[in-house]
Amino acid sequence: SEASPEVNQYTSKFDAYLAGQATLTPEEEDGLEVFRGKGLCAACHVLDPQENGEPALFTDYTFDNLGVPKNPENPVYDIDPGFVDLGLGGFLATRPDEYGQFVAENIGKQKVPTLRNVDLRPGNGFTKAYMHNGYFKTLEGVVNFYNTRDVKPACPDPLTTEADALAQGCWPAPEVAQNVNTDGLRNLCLTPMEEAALVAFMKTLSDGYFEP
């Protein structure tokens, strides 16, 4: 589970900062403030300690549809070009007798993940993938999507990669159009410096900063 020591050891720079054993850089501090406030990040990636007293896991365990585009690099499209990941709603639909009444409102919703170790990598040059389908390959792209999803125009090609979308100043259409969250994502009006600060802060969540 997300709370297990194999997944989260709570040995990040942020944990050391909370314990008074490390100091965040000015950029990291700015990112924490954006995370708590203007960026609306903490609404879902909560900063509160767990009920058992352990540090925050940066998730509220809810489900959301963020309007993430299809990942054109997903090999499933070689087999089924029409494949759509319906998320929680798709699962509930497999048990209509038990959960049928909840299907429609949960189509496209995916579980809010922990942000701990969001930038932890096994080695230099390792490319991470973010969101439920791996569409994003950079935290910078993720943050820019949160900030500008409802501002930038739609890309002409719904299978545009993150890199091409950033270069073109557009975002592809959502993989699932139903139930897209318009509260936590909109025009957040973050500046480029605030976006960069958010990324810098999230990089403080990687375990291994100190020995447990």
Residue map of PLM features:
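Periplasmic c-type cytochrome electron-transfer domains
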Residues: 1-212
